[in-house]
Amino acid sequence: MENETVSELNQTELPPQVAVALEYQVVTILLVVVICGLGIVGNIMVVLVVMRTKHMRTATNCYLVSLAVADLMVLVAAGLPNITDSIYGSWVYGYVGCLCITYLQYLGINASSCSITAFTIERYIAICHPIKAQFLCTFSRAKKIIIFVWAFTSIYCMLWFFLLDLNISTYKDAIVISCGYKISRNYYSPIYLMDFGVFYVMPMILATVLYGFIARILFLNPIPSDPKENSKTWKNDSTHQNKNMNLNTTNRCFNSTVSSRKQVTKMLAVVVILFALLWMPYRTLVVVNSFLSSPFQENWFLLFCRICIYLNSAINPVIYNLMSQKFRAAFRKLCNCKQKPTEKAANYSVALNYSVIKESDRFSTELDDITVTDTYVSTTKVSFDDTCLASEKNGPSSCTYGYSLTAKQEKI
């Protein structure tokens, strides 16, 4: 008797001759509880740190929040029901649960794929077309794109409402209820293949091509200059020492920008690679079963496929913590119970020594401003007063210009 389930994610059909082994139940429950539990906590933390930290409300992080919400949906809708499946060996959520849970499963799966595609395109534009990125890669535009992604996937996944039904199988010693199709395999196999092509093959091909272009820019060619950075030019210095200082400062800022972009791109590339690898077993199984007269449904292999999917949805916060200093600091602050609700501006006093040239009765210098970067301060342009604090001497001399830098401490 042919009785297919909607997907191996919530597969509940048992072979007629044997019940699920006790060790299988124990391993399934243990792995699902640990992986899904940690994944749910981690993805909630990602959403909270981006929403609570103003500095982290960037276009890229906006897509990561969308990915975190999609992963939460997968972990809750696809992961946790497997615990009851393992305990009871049957579907216990009824007809409405069959419709809603399956809908949320595929909504989370497809939304995560679209979110990954969106931030891949965003990274490509930001690095390879920095001028266009000034108006294309903005936080407000990212929110609009995410709204479109979720609207599209929500409508697309409504297809499952018309395909699902409860299937009842009667065996010698048990009656098994499963959430499955009310149509034959000849009709739903093309749906699986379309889903495989649109939400897995095409995004992975696009990501491979775009990250190839990104790698060429970041690692083989000089990175295109940011127009905002180009506008912050230094005046020509009247001494050789000032010229060297300006050149060194500019090089440090440039190298810092390149290093930061490389690190962000590496982190996102790891997310994409893990998505491709961890989804491959399940996606491959679906395609293969579409062409088999008797689908392959070995319990331990199905468990392996499910665990790979749950790992993909749970591991992203770990990647952010390992590869992003900002996320790591934000996670630490979120876990700190003594964290203050608001952060006030912090004052910084810096002394700067450099040479000036005496012209008649006054000192003249070409260094009118400087860009200061601190671990906890935004890159800030500081202007200097004309009064030299040092004693006047004949010829070129060294004097100290004092200033007080007041800047709002960045929330990382």
Curated annotation (Swiss-Prot):
SMART domains per record: 7TM_GPCR_Srsx
GO MF term (any one): identical protein binding
Domain of life: Eukaryota
Transmembrane portions of the chain: 29-51, 62-83, 100-121, 145-168, 194-215, 267-288, 297-319
Subcellular location: Cell membrane
GO biological process: phospholipase C-activating G protein-coupled receptor signaling pathway; positive regulation of cytosolic calcium ion concentration; positive regulation of protein-containing complex assembly
Membrane topology: Multi-pass membrane protein
Disulfide partners: 98-179
Extracellular face of the membrane: 1-28, 84-99, 169-193, 289-296
PANTHER family listed in its UniProt record: THYROTROPIN-RELEASING HORMONE RECEPTOR
Summary of the function given for this chain in its UniProt record: Receptor for thyrotropin-releasing hormone (TRH). Upon ligand binding, this G-protein-coupled receptor triggers activation of the phosphatidylinositol (IP3)-calcium-protein kinase C (PKC) pathway.
Family to which the UniProt record says this protein belongs: Belongs to the G-protein coupled receptor 1 family.
Official protein name in the record: Thyrotropin-releasing hormone receptor
Encoding gene, per UniProt annotation: Trhr
